[in-house]
Structure formats: C-alpha cells, structure tokens
A protein has these predicted regions:
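Hydrophobic alpha-helical segments that form the core
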Residues: 277-290
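Short beta-strand segments
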Residues: 53-56, 92-95, 154, 208-211, ...
C-alpha cells in the first residue's frame, strides 16, 4: 500500500465490523491494495461471496486540500451517473456509510472488477490503437453527461466555466500558501492565468469530466489475446466543465481521437483547445506540487522526488504557454 499521512490503518477487527455493517458476515482476509495516495483501500476475501473492495476516506478533520473535501461523495455520485447514462462498466457499490458511526471516516464497499488496470500491461499494449479507440468512445460517453453548472459538485456549482476554473486555481494556490509550499514562478502562474482565462469562455456546456484517466484507473481484459477496454474507476476528482481535463494524456493519440469523434463529439485540436488543455495541465501540476504537504513526510525521499517532479511540470507548462504567446 502506498504510504500517505491521509490514509487510515484500521485493524482487521475494525475492517470485519465494517464488512458486517455492509451485510458481509463471512469476510476472511484483508489485503491492503496498492492503490492511490489519498484513500485507504483493502481487498476483502470472503468464504462464499467472492472478493470485494473496501475504500475509506481520510479521517474526519484530517488536513487535506480544499478540493479534496468530501471527494468520496463525488465518486459515488459519478458512479451513479456513469452507470445510468452510459454503457461504461463501473464497480457496483454494495454499501456506503457516511455517518461516522463505524469508523471516523466516509467509506464504501464495492465489487472487484474483472480484468486489471492498464498500468499493469506492457507499454505496447497500452498504445494499442483498438484500445485507444475504445477509450476515446468511452470518454465521449462521459462527456455526454451534462450538469446544471460548472465546477466541483462539493463546492456548489458556478454559472460559467471561467468562474469555476478561477475558483479552482485560487483555492489550490491558497492551499499552497497555507501549507508553506512555495510554488515556483508563482507570479508568472498568476499572470498566465489572467492572460489566458478568456480562452475558457468557449466552454458553454458543463459536461462530466473524470479528470484522472490515468492507466491505473482504466481496466482492461484479455480476449483472444487482445486487450479490450473493460471499465473505469476512481472518478473522485470529477468536475463539471471543460472536457479538456480528460485530454491531458491523449493529445498525441490519434486512435483516441478517432474513437472520441466517432461517438459524436466533433472536436478540432486547435489553438483554443490546446490552451485550455494547458490550463488544465497547469492546474493539475499545482495540485501535485501542493498535495505532498498533506500526504508525505516532509523532506522524505518520496516528498522531495514528487516536489521536484511537480515543480518541473509547472515550469514546463509555463514554457509551453510562452511559446503559444509568441
């Protein structure tokens, strides 16, 4: 299990009590899952009901970033929407408890999905055109789910994407200051946001954006020796707004775009979309730079490595903005 200060370390007795509350009385073994750096995740084996996944938020009152508060509520809402409005497979949630009675955190129990994360597959499999095309189609289905406002559901929605995005970036910069994290080139970050914020006004419709479509969150299964897209997990970072937030890893994947447009989304990779994607890339880099303050032991090797990597990404993204401004 990835070490993080936000993760709870329940005893087997506490885990068994949670399963019992969820109606699973034959839990036998609990295995920490190597999943994520925020929530605690355990695989639960049972005598007669297969394997389940138990997921716990940080302890109530634990230091977290502003946008991380109540993220588990967002995850379950997104699962319901995806299940109801698309053909995308997501885990079936067996039970959820946000009362704090059993554990001082939000938690839920869900089924274990068939297949494995794309991150566990060889690189050539990850780049399979058929797989990328299917992922493009699935992403287009996500973006066809429309909301009533912009931003994070847990904050309350805004009337425009520009207002929502500026609020998101304001909070992460304020979090960094509160936690003593000195964002590199912060003045240039602010100037860049002011200079390019008008590019966001083209986004008129709030669509559901996963915003964490990493290979770890994309499930695949093998059929006749070929990898097939199977499911999506962990939409706890989801927001309503610009679909560009889901293009960060796929801008060079032509097969992804083929699938996305085949599903009815005609998007042109033009200067505006490039700038909007860079704005989301900058926001994500700011998150990565700041979140280590609440997750990792200060000055540990992992802390320094993540800090350096995120700082490098901030500077790289600013260089790309400067190139666009020429």
């Amino acid at each position: 299990m990835i070490q993080s200060k936000t993760k709870l370390l329940p005893s087997n007795r506490e885990l068994a009590q949670m399963c019992s509350r969820a109606g699973i009385s034959d839990a036998q073994e609990f295995f920490p899952a190597d999943s994520g750096g925020f929530n605690s995740v355990y695989r639960v084996s049972t005598a007669a009901h297969g394997i389940f996944i138990l997921k716990m938020s940080p302890r109530y009152g634990a230091p977290v970033l502003t946008h991380e508060r109540n993220m588990m509520h967002t995850e379950l809402t997104a699962y319901d929407l995806i299940r109801s409005h698309t053909s995308i497979r997501v885990p079936r949630v067996i039970f959820s408890d946000f009362s704090g009675k059993c554990m001082p955190c939000d938690w839920f129990l869900m089924e274990e999905l068939e297949g494995c994360p794309l991150a566990q597959m060889p690189r050539d499999v990850r780049q399979s055109p058929d797989l990328m095309r299917a992922l493009g189609e699935a992403t287009a289905q996500l973006h066809a789910i429309l909301g009533e406002g912009f931003g994070y559901e847990q904050w309350g929605l805004r009337g425009s994407w520009r207002d929502a995005y500026l609020e998101m970036t304001h909070h992460i910069i304020a979090d960094a200051k509160r936690l003593g994290a000195e964002i590199p080139c912060v003045r240039e970050v602010r100037e860049t946001l002011r200079h390019f914020e008008r590019e966001l006004d083209v986004v008129k419709t709030p669509c559901l954006v996963h915003f964490d479509l990493r290979p770890e969150h994309i499930f695949v299964r093998q059929e006749a020796g070929a990898p097939l897209f199977s499911a999506v997990i962990d939409p706890d970072c989801a927001y309503w707004g610009d679909p560009a937030g889901d293009f960060l890893l796929f801008d060079q994947q032509s097969a992804f775009w083929e699938g996305y447009q085949a599903a009815g989304h005609a998007l042109e990779w033009n200067r505006n979309l490039q700038l909007r994607t860079l704005l989301m890339q900058l926001y994500l880099a700011l998150i990565h730079y700041t979140r280590v303050e609440v997750r990792l032991e200060k000055n540990s090797f992992l802390y320094r490595r993540e800090k350096w990597s995120a700082g490098h990404e901030i500077k790289r993204t600013l260089r790309l903005f400067r190139d666009c401004a020429k």
